[in-house]
Amino acid sequence: MSITPEEKARLMKEFATKEGDTGSPEVQVAILTSRISTLTEHFKSHKKDNHSRRGLLMMVAQRRKLLDYARAKDEGRYQDLIKRLGIRR
């Protein structure tokens, strides 16, 4: 249900704003989006896993907060991010 360290490193490299960037909203949203999509696939075969569903809802809420922050800081970067990730908004 979690993402591999290689996948996480790839996302950090792809969405980083500068070398060694691990904490920018873009990187955090990309990692959360990957984890959310992994959990969504998990729920297709484990419909009654409510414990993990709670974790999914918390991840979605955290991503929403980070996206709101990114939008408030720089609308252009926000639009680019949701386009690159394919997030509906």
UniProtKB/Swiss-Prot annotation:
Example GO biological process: translation
Keyword terms, alphabetized: Ribonucleoprotein, Ribosomal protein, RNA-binding, rRNA-binding
PROSITE patterns: RIBOSOMAL_S15
Zinc listed as a keyword: no
Gene Ontology CC: cytosolic small ribosomal subunit
Pfam families noted in UniProt: Ribosomal_S15 (PF00312)
MF (Gene Ontology): rRNA binding; structural constituent of ribosome
Statement: the UniProt record of this protein carries the keyword Zinc: no
Protein family membership: Belongs to the universal ribosomal protein uS15 family.
Subunit structure: Part of the 30S ribosomal subunit. Forms a bridge to the 50S subunit in the 70S ribosome, contacting the 23S rRNA.
UniProt-listed PANTHER family: RIBOSOMAL PROTEIN S15, BACTERIAL AND ORGANELLAR, SMALL RIBOSOMAL SUBUNIT PROTEIN US15M
Protein function: One of the primary rRNA binding proteins, it binds directly to 16S rRNA where it helps nucleate assembly of the platform of the 30S subunit by binding and bridging several RNA helices of the 16S rRNA.
Designated name of the protein: Small ribosomal subunit protein uS15
Lineage of the organism: Bacteria, Pseudomonadati, Pseudomonadota, Alphaproteobacteria, Rhodobacterales
